[in-house]
Amino acid sequence: MVQASGHRRSTRGSKMVSWSVIAKIQEIWCEEDERKMVREFLAEFMSTYVMMVFGLGSVAHMVLNKTYGSYLGVNLGFGFGVTMGVHVAGRISGAHMNAAVTFTNCALGRVPWRKFPVHVLGQFLGSFLAAATIYSLFYTAILHFSGGELMVTGPFATAGIFATYLPDHMTLWRGFLNEEWLTRMLQLCLFTITDQENNPALPGTHALVISILVVIIRVSHGINTGYAINPSRDPPPSIFTFIAGWGKQVFSDGENWWWVPVVAPLLGASLGGIIYLVFIGSTIPREPLKLEDSVAYEDHGITVLPKMGSHEPMISPLTLISVSLANRSSVHSAPPLHESMALEHF
């Protein structure tokens, strides 16, 4: 009887713990703002994971077997990986998949700063898990190619599958300038593609156009540094390779190159955004600004799957401007944008 009574108390206690956990989860989800933050975290996590799995997988093909992989294949893998990532999370978080893009949007007032750590944490975890996935899928191929050794440099190096490394013909600071400039061009063109008041991509084509931008950057300037242009792309896989057995050389190689793909893109994206706003964005007449947290704010995104409907407000993704088609004299007859998605992207 004593044992039975103890068992009942144990069962009752476990049930109380279970219900308290469930109640806590429900309490978290009852707040709209907290629910939105969780959704955006998961969206950045999944979109970055999708982009990196396709991108790193294409690099693995190029490194491990020239018959199945190529440099062009790597560019297409990352480019179309971005497309899939945008479709995974564009309407939820904007599918930045890039900490430099998130930082720039926060610095320029397009995204609240409280979302910055949420987005970046999701991006880093997604990138780390993608590296772990590629390692698991290509484990035997990696060992076969390298003779059982996990090397960072040399003809049988495999660390480059997961992260970028400074080539022999580049110096550290030339590499820094290269990464800064490429990320500057990336952000400038992203603002161009998504500015509804300028000459944006056609409704429903933004994901594809952005992937074309990524491919163009990679095929035209990839030889110098491997074009990280994304703080969420390099450090997490480097951390994984350090844990998996490649050793501390993943950080020390190339004159301690590891920090450049973090700092240079942050600087470059910020400059690219400012350059666009000063030289292009400021010259375009716009309606009064409505902040994201305003009661009147509805959406600040880009249509991926446009639908026909009534003339509802259109939102400029560049400055979060709410523009009604009914009161714009300069707007020609065109189908309205509806069901829009946020994209201040990668």
From Swiss-Prot:
Species annotation: Homo sapiens
Record flagged with keyword Transmembrane helix: yes
Keywords, alphabetical: Membrane, Transmembrane, Transmembrane helix, Transport
Annotated site residues (Selectivity filter) in this chain: 78, 227, 233
Gene3D superfamilies registered for this protein in UniProt: Glycerol uptake facilitator protein (1.20.1080.10)
InterPro entries the UniProt entry points to: Aquaporin-like, MIP, MIP/Aquaporin
GO annotations of cellular component type: basolateral plasma membrane; plasma membrane
Intramembrane residue stretches from the record: 94-107, 226-239
Subunit relationships: Homotetramer; each monomer provides an independent glycerol/water pore.
Stretches of the chain found on the membrane's Extracellular side: 59-71, 137-174, 222-225, 240-257
Membrane-protein topology: Multi-pass membrane protein
Subcellular location(s) of the protein: Membrane
SUPFAM superfamilies documented for this protein: Aquaporin-like
Protein name, per record: Putative aquaporin-7B
Job description of the protein: Aquaglyceroporins form homotetrameric transmembrane channels, with each monomer independently mediating glycerol and water transport across the plasma membrane along their osmotic gradient.
Listed GO MF terms: glycerol channel activity; water channel activity
Transmembrane stretches, start-end: 41-58, 72-89, 116-136, 175-192, 205-221, 258-279
UniProt similarity note: Belongs to the MIP/aquaporin (TC 1.A.8) family.
Position of sequence motif NPA 1: 98-100
Record note on domains: Aquaporins contain two tandem repeats each containing three membrane-spanning domains and a pore-forming loop with the signature motif Asn-Pro/Ala-Ala/Ser (NPA).
Motif (NPA 2): 230-232
Any GO BP: water transport
Reaction it catalyzes: glycerol(in) = glycerol(out); H2O(in) = H2O(out)
Ranges in the topological domain labelled Cytoplasmic: 1-40, 90-93, 108-115, 193-204, 280-346
